[in-house]
């Protein structure tokens, strides 16, 4: 069955434009930077940055601890973004909301992004962060058995 000229034109209009991911990820990073918002109600949680060292570089981790919550679980969160976009800044609101909604401490990992950092940089950073969080769980106010690894999209893969 042939597609009519009118249908072909409609499909063309409704189709996604051709995107060169090798170029568009830089634009996506800038858009995320502009859209990332600081925390809505900082009285609901305590936030601090905690670097983890992996070889010769540090891996930033941002901790979101709900205020007034006794020892609970810690959600070690790896952000999404196709391994090329996303940061702990762009996920601030998500992590803060997650901490408030669950009553759990959330530790967001800012792993190195491709293509500037080739595989296996991202999984190595995530492993270093997980190792440090498990080793020093008590300093985050949790027991090791209450540390849960979670991720969004590419972060779930990591």
Regions found by a protein language model. Name each.
Residues 61, 76-78, 98, 119-158:
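Short strand-loop-helix active-site module centered on a catalytic nucleophile
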Residues 1-63:
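A glycine/proline-hinged amphipathic helix-loop "lid/cap" segment
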Residues 110-114:
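Short beta-to-alpha linker loops that shape the active-site pocket of alpha/beta-hydrolase fold enzymes
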Residues 71-81:
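Short beta-strand element of the alpha/beta-hydrolase
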Residues 44, 58, 103, 144-146:
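A generic structural signal for alpha->beta connector loops
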Residues 88-109:
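Short amphipathic alpha-helix adjacent to the substrate-entry channel of hydrolases
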Residues 87-89, 117-119:
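Conserved catalytic-core motifs of eukaryotic protein kinase domains, centered on the activation segment
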């Amino acid at each position: 069955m042939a597609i009519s000229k009118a249908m072909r034109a409609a499909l063309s209009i409704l189709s996604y434009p051709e995107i060169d991911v090798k170029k568009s990820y830089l634009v996506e990073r800038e858009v995320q930077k502009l859209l990332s918002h600081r925390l809505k109600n900082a009285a609901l949680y305590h936030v601090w940055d905690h670097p983890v060292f992996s070889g010769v570089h540090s891996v930033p981790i941002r901790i979101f601890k709900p205020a007034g919550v006794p020892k609970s679980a810690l959600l070690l969160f790896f952000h999404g973004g196709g391994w090329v976009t996303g940061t702990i800044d762009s996920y601030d609101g998500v992590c803060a909301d997650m901490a408030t909604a669950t009553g759990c401490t959330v530790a967001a990992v800012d792993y190195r992004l491709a293509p500037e950092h080739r595989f296996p940089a991202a999984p190595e950073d995530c492993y270093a962060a997980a190792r440090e969080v498990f080793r020093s769980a008590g300093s985050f106010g949790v027991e090791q058995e209450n540390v849960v690894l979670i991720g969004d999209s590419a972060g779930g893969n990591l």
